[in-house]
């Protein structure tokens, strides 16, 4: 920082001169403070989870701006002019990768961003993630097969497959979806291609650890002066995530295997379910995206799976409307958990208890297990401390 000495000049000046010198000194201090703020690494992160990770790693050495708000979803996000302005001024952009953020390329071009892009997904084993995705699709294949069977029945029962109303509309609120193609896959809905890997990598704490490590490494390369700080904070936060993972595993292991079956809002919790050995009976929206539309046949097949696998509750996600979940729960005669929504695509707003990644994961663990009729123990001190973000 620059220090300006005004001692000799002040001695030569009268009261007016001294006042002027004092003003110059204060102006200099103000400029120095602004310079210090300007010296911070300017970071823009796409999702709320990545914004939290970047904040945890960056600490006082960064100025982090998140593009998505609490409750926002990367599946249908459109940057505002303010978002583009922040991006254009940033030194670093942190993205998820795995084809989650379709808006990034156009946003980078429109904003004129010319900094460093850190792809958090590069910190994990994507080959393993692809395999876990495939295993999840195999597990849910019973739902897809049932949907095809239902669709086949519809073809026989209705001469015009585009006009059928799927029975009594009063008893089937989802009739409006009946003209959807039952065999529609999760990866080609609306022309979006997510590849072979479910992009919701952060839902497993051990994958979050790899993403945080990638962010810490990226910050260190972009800002070598503070590299040691980024490394230290990253290691400390990863240690907390390790404790979080261990705690969650212990909670789910205490639940009988037959009860560990879940229906989610959309296919967003694949890695969470895999790591904690939770069965997947299907999703309300059978897609990686949360703005897809299920067919009537897919809904009927999901209801059949709920009955067949003894699902106790259907969960609503914070970024989704509970309307369809309530319809399915009513048809399946099970509970819909909409008062304690799960946080998958987005973290919660301030005061929700899920405004941090750690807090959201603890919340999801507790909400799921309690809906199954179980209970959880208090998380470790380090995890509890990190829940406030």
Task: Give residue ranges: language-model regions.
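Extracytoplasmic metal-acquisition and chelation regions
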Residues: 2-20, 25-389
């Amino acid at each position: 920082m620059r220090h300006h000495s005004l001692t000799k000049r002040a001695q030569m000046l009268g009261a007016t001169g001294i006042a002027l010198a004092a003003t110059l000194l204060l102006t200099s201090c103000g400029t120095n403070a602004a310079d210090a703020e300007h010296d911070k690494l300017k970071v823009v992160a796409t999702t709320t989870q990545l914004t939290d990770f970047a904040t945890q790693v960056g600490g006082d050495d960064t100025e982090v701006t998140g593009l998505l708000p609490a409750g926002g979803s990367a599946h249908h996000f459109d940057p505002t002019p303010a978002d583009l302005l922040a991006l254009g001024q940033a030194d670093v952009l942190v993205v998820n990768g795995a084809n989650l953020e379709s808006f990034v390329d156009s946003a980078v071009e429109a904003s004129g961003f010319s900094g460093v892009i850190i792809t958090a997904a590069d910190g994990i084993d994507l080959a393993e993630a692809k395999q876990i995705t495939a295993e999840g699709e195999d597990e849910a294949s019973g739902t897809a097969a049932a949907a095809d069977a239902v669709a086949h029945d519809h073809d026989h029962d209705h001469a015009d497959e585009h006009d059928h109303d799927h029975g009594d509309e009063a008893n089937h609120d989802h009739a409006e979806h009946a003209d959807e193609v039952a065999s529609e896959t999760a990866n080609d809905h609306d022309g979006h291609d997510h590849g072979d890997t479910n992009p919701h990598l952060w839902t497993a704490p051990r994958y979050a650890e790899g993403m945080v490590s990638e962010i810490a490494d990226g910050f260190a390369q972009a800002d070598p002066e503070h590299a040691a700080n980024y490394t230290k904070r990253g290691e400390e936060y990863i240690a907390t995530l390790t404790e979080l993972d261990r705690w969650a595993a212990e909670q789910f292991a205490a639940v009988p295997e037959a009860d560990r079956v879940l229906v989610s809002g959309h296919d967003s919790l694949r890695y969470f379910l895999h790591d904690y050995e939770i069965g997947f009976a299907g999703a309300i929206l059978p897609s990686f995206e949360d703005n897809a539309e299920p067919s009537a046949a897919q809904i009927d097949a999901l209801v059949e799976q709920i009955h067949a696998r003894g699902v106790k509750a259907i969960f609503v996600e914070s970024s989704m409307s509970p309307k369809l979940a309530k319809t399915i729960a009513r048809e399946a005669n099970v509970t819909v958990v909409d008062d304690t929504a799960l946080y998958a695509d987005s973290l919660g707003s301030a005061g929700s208890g899920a405004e941090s990644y750690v807090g959201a994961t603890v919340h999801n663990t507790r909400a799921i297990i309690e809906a199954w009729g179980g209970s959880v123990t208090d998380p470790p001190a380090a995890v509890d401390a990190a829940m406030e973000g």
